[in-house]
UniProtKB/Swiss-Prot annotation:
Catalytic activity: (2R)-2,3-dihydroxy-3-methylbutanoate + NADP(+) = (2S)-2-acetolactate + NADPH + H(+); (2R,3R)-2,3-dihydroxy-3-methylpentanoate + NADP(+) = (S)-2-ethyl-2-hydroxy-3-oxobutanoate + NADPH + H(+)
A GO molecular function held by the record: NADP binding
UniProt binding sites for Mg(2+) 2: 191, 227, 231
Protein name (record): Ketol-acid reductoisomerase (NADP(+))
Cofactor note: Binds 2 magnesium ions per subunit.
Binding site for Mg(2+) 1: 191, 195
Active-site residues annotated for this sequence: 108
Length: 326
């Protein structure tokens, strides 16, 4: 049974008299920094000097510093820049500015788990990972609630790393919704698996192949779009609010029977296991590193295929018709 922490299980005391240096001011960086500040935590922002994030953070009222200076000034250095740039930024701007007893914070365990960032032994290394995008992290906090999150400790130099992770989670509103104790390995492997198998990869290609199957069989693309893409939101909203059984309770008997008897035929669990093994073995991480070093050639080609697909052209027309796009 998972260990779940609520608001009453955490204290802000571990953050008293400490400065949190948030490295990066993108979607998560902005949201987490604002939540921390609104909870009374001393927050500074570390970004590339003169860039758009620098100006935006200053406009939002933060003290903004170049990354090396922010890392030196922070007691907690919370790294919220994209995974693929973290190792170089860490090596060049953060590592040498860490002091004994500092803490390194992450919202994704990727670079620590795969050994792309190797922190010194004299710092705590914690994970505070909200299970939602930055705009939702901020919105729910301002509404008096919060986003569920995961917390973990990779390295506990001070003996107080978990208390610090929970304090960070509380300050950002996550303990209001519930925070699950995990490990760096579990967070990254399940996160990548979810992205690749269903949330991004699985859903994307299920939609494309379903659309193509109908169009190739002679059905109108516009009708195929509604049946394979547009109506998906209705089902996902039901699952999100009521669970799988609740969704089945709210569709027709015909839809339920057809889905239950045919759905398994289009899903290949053996391929899912292969994807999971690629993640667990580090094969995917090595592939992604090489992809970035080569200028993301494969990713750009695949992205172009999606952008030029008929479903996108049909969808653009229909979304305009429905008033979703200008």
């Amino acid at each position: 049974m998972a260990k779940i922490y609520g608001d009453e299980d955490a204290s802000l005391e571990p953050l008293e008299d400490k400065t949190v240096a948030v490295i990066g001011y993108g979607s998560q960086g902005e949201a987490q920094a604002k939540n921390l500040r609104d909870s009374g935590i001393d927050v500074i922002i570390g970004v590339r000097e003169g860039g758009p994030s620098w100006e935006r953070a200053k406009k939002d009222g933060f003290e903004v510093l170049p990354i090396p200076e922010a890392a030196e000034a922070g007691d907690v250095v919370h790294i919220l820049i994209p995974d693929e740039v973290q190792p170089q930024v860490y090596r060049e701007h953060i590592h040498d500015n860490l002091e004994k007893g500092n803490a390194l914070g992450f919202s994704h365990a990727y670079n620590i788990h795969y050994g792309l960032i190797e922190p010194p032994e004299y710092v705590d290394v914690i994970l505070v990972a909200p299970k939602g995008p930055g705009h939702m992290v901020r919105k729910l906090y301002t509404e008096g609630f919060g986003t569920p999150a995961l917390v973990a400790v990779h390295q506990d130099y001070t003996g107080e790393a978990m208390d610090l992770a929970l304090a960070m989670a509380k300050a950002m509103g996550f303990t209001r919704a519930g925070v699950i104790k995990t490990t760096f390995r579990e967070e990254v492997e399940t996160d990548l698996f979810g992205e690749q198998v269903d949330l991004v990869g699985g859903v994307l290609y299920m939609i494309l192949y379903a659309f193509e199957t109908l169009v190739e069989a002679g059905y109108q693309p516009e009708v195929a779009y509604f049946e394979t893409l547009h109506e998906l939101k209705l089902i996902v909203d039901l699952i999100y609010e009521k669970g799988l059984s609740g969704m089945l309770d709210n569709v027709s008997n015909t839809a339920e029977y057809g889905g239950l008897t045919r759905g398994k035929r289009i899903i290949n669990k053996e391929e899912m296991r292969k994807v999971l093994e690629e993640i667990r073995s580090g094969e995917f991480a090595r592939e992604w590193t090489l992809e970035n070093e080569s200028g993301r050639i494969v990713m750009k080609r695949l992205r172009e295929e999606i952008e030029n697909h008929e479903i996108e052209k049909v969808g653009e027309r229909l979304r305009k018709m429905m008033g979703f796009e200008d």
